[in-house]
């Protein structure tokens, strides 16, 4: 059986776990490696896997990045047809990609083109994302580790800010997440409302600049400093902030700078904007063991789907209940994932940090902070 597999979109700390687990169930003769994501698929950048490539992939289990190469690519309908032609030329029987919701939509499109051409191509998706915006599942591998990094960063940043409040009064941490707030909301994990961020802003809500300045003013008057966390996709005064546009994709970012400048100009407080940056998706010391295990499991499950002749599905991660976390892997039709769009953070998790934290606890592999060590309780000031 000839199987082509690739990685697409932004990497995660555990994306290589899924790849290594998938290829470990096949012989070298079965696997064709697609290099550089959908660009490689559209330009015939495929190579048969040999022992050297297998060893490299196996070593990549403990590394971030995407060992096959990934990246962004405007995979247009014309390029999808071109990619299918290359797959047919190489007599590829199954196409598997590890990626997010855009990747799943692309897989669904290629499957449809193959059906129209009468070519029996099996198509399977393996989920990954730090944003947790894939429809039809509870969460995707990659999110748990990113959430852990955000939670730790916010926790320690607030302790640092508390110590420096006579020099710096306001700090704004900006997270990834695109148009959903799952990752930003993780900044309050394991802490009481009082000890966590003074406010968390997510894209599922719209905010005015005056509302945000009011939150800053209240926190500063109460304790002399304020820590805000904001997702990159948040809209302020009906405007979203973008850094640039690349390969047909808007690159969000910079909203923390908007707030920093407003705080400095209108409240005359010393403020600092900090983007948590790419470490959210690649800081391997913060990897969640649960996330790592689930990334490997979805790769193995996807291999079984291919070997059983299944097609048109993404591997789904679901849970039995929130309080006693246990993951269950299922098949989710690519049609549902594609049609579902971006999975938003529910109102309950926005309004009740405790409810969100209970949902996150089984995934993040990070103990809550004891009440004795919460930010604010360790100061004698």
From Swiss-Prot:
<dbReference type="GO" id="GO:0003872">
    <property type="term" value="F:6-phosphofructokinase activity"/>
</dbReference>
<keyword id="KW-0479">Metal-binding</keyword>
<keyword id="KW-0547">Nucleotide-binding</keyword>
<dbReference type="InterPro" id="IPR035966">
    <property type="entry name" value="PKF_sf"/>
</dbReference>
<dbReference type="GO" id="GO:0006002">
    <property type="term" value="P:fructose 6-phosphate metabolic process"/>
</dbReference>
<protein>
    <recommendedName>
        <fullName>Sulfofructose kinase</fullName>
        <ecNumber>2.7.1.184</ecNumber>
    </recommendedName>
</protein>
<comment type="similarity">
    <text>Belongs to the phosphofructokinase type A (PFKA) family.</text>
</comment>
<comment type="function">
    <text>Part of the sulfo-EMP2 pathway, a D-sulfoquinovose degradation pathway that produces sulfolactate (SL). Phosphorylates 6-deoxy-6-sulfo-D-fructose (SF) to 6-deoxy-6-sulfo-D-fructose 1-phosphate (SFP).</text>
</comment>
<dbReference type="InterPro" id="IPR050929">
    <property type="entry name" value="PFKA"/>
</dbReference>
<keyword id="KW-0808">Transferase</keyword>
<dbReference type="GO" id="GO:0046872">
    <property type="term" value="F:metal ion binding"/>
</dbReference>
<dbReference type="InterPro" id="IPR022953">
    <property type="entry name" value="ATP_PFK"/>
</dbReference>
<feature type="binding site">
    <location>
        <begin position="72"/>
        <end position="73"/>
    </location>
    <ligand>
        <name>ATP</name>
    </ligand>
</feature>
<dbReference type="Pfam" id="PF00365">
    <property type="entry name" value="PFK"/>
</dbReference>
<feature type="binding site">
    <location>
        <position position="10"/>
    </location>
    <ligand>
        <name>ATP</name>
    </ligand>
</feature>
<keyword id="KW-0460">Magnesium</keyword>
<feature type="binding site">
    <location>
        <begin position="100"/>
        <end position="103"/>
    </location>
    <ligand>
        <name>ATP</name>
    </ligand>
</feature>
<dbReference type="GO" id="GO:0005524">
    <property type="term" value="F:ATP binding"/>
</dbReference>
<feature type="binding site">
    <location>
        <position position="101"/>
    </location>
    <ligand>
        <name>Mg(2+)</name>
    </ligand>
</feature>
<keyword id="KW-0119">Carbohydrate metabolism</keyword>
<feature type="active site" description="Proton acceptor">
    <location>
        <position position="131"/>
    </location>
</feature>
<keyword id="KW-0067">ATP-binding</keyword>
<dbReference type="InterPro" id="IPR000023">
    <property type="entry name" value="Phosphofructokinase_dom"/>
</dbReference>
<keyword id="KW-0418">Kinase</keyword>
């Amino acid at each position: 059986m000839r199987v082509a597999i690739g990685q697409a979109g932004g990497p995660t700390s555990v994306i290589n776990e899924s790849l290594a687990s998938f290829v470990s169930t096949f012989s070298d003769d079965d696997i064709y490696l697609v290099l550089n994501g959908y660009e490689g698929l559209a330009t015939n950048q495929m190579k048969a896997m040999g022992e050297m490539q297998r060893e490299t992939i196996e070593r990549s289990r403990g590394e971030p990045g995407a060992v096959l190469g990934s990246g962004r690519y405007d995979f247009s309908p014309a390029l999808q047809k071109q990619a299918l032609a290359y797959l047919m030329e190489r007599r590829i029987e199954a196409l598997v990609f590890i990626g997010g919701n855009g990747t799943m939509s692309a897989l669904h499109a290629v499957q449809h083109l193959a059906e129209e051409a009468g070519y029996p191509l099996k198509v399977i998706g393996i989920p990954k994302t730090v944003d947790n915006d894939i429809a039809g599942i509870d969460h995707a591998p990659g999110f748990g580790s990113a959430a852990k990094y955000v939670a730790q960063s916010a926790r320690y940043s607030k302790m640092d800010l508390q110590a420096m409040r006579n020099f710096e009064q306001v700090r704004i941490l900006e997270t990834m997440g695109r148009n959903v707030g799952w990752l930003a909301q993780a900044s309050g994990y394991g802490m009481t409302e009082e000890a966590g961020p003074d406010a968390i802003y997510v894209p599922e809500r719209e905010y005015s600049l005056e509302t945000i300045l009011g939150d800053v003013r209240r926190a500063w008057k109460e304790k002399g400093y304020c820590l805000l966390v904001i997702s990159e996709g948040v809209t302020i005064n009906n405007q979203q902030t973008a850094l640039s546009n690349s390969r047909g994709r808007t690159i969000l970012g910079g909203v923390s700078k908007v707030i920093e400048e407003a705080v400095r100009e209108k409240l005359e407080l010393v403020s600092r904007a900090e983007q948590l940056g790419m470490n959210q998706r690649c800081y391997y010391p913060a990897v969640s063991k649960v996330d790592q295990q689930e990334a490997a499991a979805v790769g193995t499950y996807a291999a079984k789907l291919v070997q059983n002749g299944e097609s048109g599905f993404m591997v789904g991660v679901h849970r039995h209940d929130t309080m006693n976390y246990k993951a269950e892997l299922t098949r989710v039709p690519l049609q549902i994932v594609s049609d579902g769009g971006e999975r938003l953070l529910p109102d309950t998790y926005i309004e009740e940090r405790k409810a969100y934290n209970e949902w996150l606890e089984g995934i993040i592999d990070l103990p809550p902070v004891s009440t004795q060590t919460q930010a604010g309780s360790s100061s004698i000031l």
